[in-house]
């Protein structure tokens, strides 16, 4: 029997004007209710994004209001972590991770 994804969304709306990696980590921890053991580093972010077992909704949306003001290197790392985390959920039949950024005009 195949379990279907619960289509109820969990929206993590990421605030604007995040100035650095520390602010981004704090915002993600707050909006995604990361556990107390979250280490506020890239490895810990990837681990938590690939778990999210504490969120019961089936569709988890991380919506950015703007692009975080990170260094080019940190922005690349963040993008790669998000892509890898999304990919890690591809075969999961009960959850789906969606990440949104504003369209650049």
Segments from the language model and where they lie:
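Positively charged, polar, low-complexity stretches
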Residues: 1-105
């Amino acid at each position: 029997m195949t379990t279907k994804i619960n289509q109820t969304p969990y929206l993590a709306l990421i605030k604007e004007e995040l100035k650095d990696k520390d602010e981004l980590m704090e915002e993600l921890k707050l909006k995604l209710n990361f556990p107390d053991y979250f280490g506020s580093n890239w490895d810990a972010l990837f681990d938590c994004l690939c778990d999210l077992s504490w969120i019961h909704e089936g569709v988890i949306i991380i919506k950015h209001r703007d692009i975080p003001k990170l260094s080019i290197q940190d922005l690349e790392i963040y993008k790669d972590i998000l892509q890898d985390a999304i990919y890690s959920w591809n075969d999961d039949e009960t959850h789906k991770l969606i990440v949104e950024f504003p369209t650049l005009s």
